């Protein structure tokens, strides 16, 4: 399953790696949206709000885990690019050990804190019971959710984006089937949505483990690889921690924005929750470019080919920008019927259309700074991604959303525009940092 990405056409390598990841991301987004869509078909606005708020919290947890795993992807990629499979095996073994410990810790803390957490995010009173039920079930399943995401990160470090696609396809199909069963005939509401998500990812992990045993990976993992090694864990955390904190802060910003929407009432809360799900689907290419640039650049830097790594960044940013412009034009035309797929409430559709027409512009700028973030991580400088995101959140995204909510009580459009404004600032910082370090010759350092 290991694949070398350091030779041949850079553009072709991007497409070869990115297309399976694109499909994987689409499938993962699809099963995430299935919870909200099926809940909207069978339940009321209170259940929609519960699932929207609960899934927002779970998405935050997931991106923190995936962000931390970026360290594993990069370290494995460096080892594969350099042809050192022993280092790759050590990185994989220590990744498994680290993340199983992290997942058990998350489970213990979050199950105990679920009610205070729901109170903290300001869920409307009507949706509190459903949100608590949803999160309790999902928190119990954190070890399986972690394993599900870590398996994909390891394979991408090996240059294999196809195998995770198959595992995600299993989870997607299972989640949709279970959601229909649990939320429809069994009328379990948010509980059914949580069960569908957790059980489907558990099934995917089981399938992945069987798949790994049946295919030749070129790796020989031993018990020694799973013993914690300070040097290996240090390299993983050096890259992964800034990305995890960065992604966590981004999700905190989203939750703060959700809290702002919650305080505007049930209708606006439901509208923002639905749009967040749609936006996550629209981010399929920006997110794919982040993963693609980090994996390809890691292998190329490990192989001593920094020029190919820079070309990867260039092509990825161009692809993401073109995609973003196309998505903006399409959403402006189909916003109403798209929102109507998730709810029959005309007022929720109206407010959601206002929000998404401002928010969707973010796909243009996010694609660029996502590409830079992946590149900086591959260069061993993931702290730059952390810094530009924190600055954008603190100076623009959160205060912009708050002020827009206070100044424009009758519309969600200005709130939606806060996101692309923050991403534009991130792009400016990324370009400036890249040019400055390139002139100084300090871009490429060992991870």
Residue ranges and their predicted role:
Residues 16-32, 137, 171, 200-204, ...:
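Transmembrane helical elements of multi-pass membrane transporters/channels
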